């Protein structure tokens, strides 16, 4: 798995974090003041990149969390199968299958020979944009 580490206090809206083993995009960060006993706490609300599920993380601001490394690639659609798409990476010429996106905006643009941008996060791939 390709991950790095950072503290909860350094997370910003729009950054990525691993919660419950799934990479998530941070949509809200709130920090509570330090109390008489203990350290400041942060409440992080994030949405899963692959599942779209809302996840929360409540932790001290100095706690270490995993941050996924996102590798961005360009590929070309070779074949459109029922629920998957066969894609060839335009840098390495590797051929693989990737799940068809559920968003209507992306699904309507999928056709053979179209170029697309996909992200590889923690060994999984997701189509982000179809050109």
From Swiss-Prot:
An annotated Gene Ontology molecular function: translation elongation factor activity
What InterPro entries does its record include? IF5A-like, IF5A-like_N, NA-bd_OB-fold, Rib_uL2_dom2, Trans_elong_IF5A_hypusine_site, Transl_elong_IF5A_arc, Transl_elong_IF5A_C, Translation_prot_SH3-like_sf
Q: Which Gene3D superfamilies match?
A: 2.30.30.30, Nucleic acid-binding proteins
* Keywords on record: Cytoplasm, Hypusine, Initiation factor, Protein biosynthesis
**Superkingdom, according to UniProt?**
Archaea
Q: Which residues carry this modification: Hypusine?
A: 36
Protein biosynthesis found in the keyword field: yes
Concerning Pfam families, the annotation shows: eIF-5a, IF5A-like_N
What is the role of the protein in this entry? Functions by promoting the formation of the first peptide bond.
Q: Give the protein's recorded name.
A: Translation initiation factor 5A
């Amino acid at each position: 798995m390709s991950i790095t580490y950072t503290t909860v206090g350094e997370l910003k809206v729009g950054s990525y974090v691993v919660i419950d083993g799934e990479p998530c995009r941070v949509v809200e960060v709130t920090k509570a003041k330090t109390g008489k006993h203990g350290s400041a706490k942060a409440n992080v609300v994030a949405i899963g990149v692959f599942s779209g599920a809302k996840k929360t993380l409540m932790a001290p601001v100095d706690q270490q969390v995993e941050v996924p490394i996102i590798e961005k690639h360009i590929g070309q659609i070779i074949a459109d199968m029922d629920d998957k798409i066969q894609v060839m990476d335009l840098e390495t010429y590797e051929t693989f299958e990737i799940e068809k996106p559920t968003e209507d905006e992306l699904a309507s643009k999928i056709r053979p020979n179209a170029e697309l941008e996909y992200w590889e996060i923690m060994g999984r791939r997701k189509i982000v944009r179809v050109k």
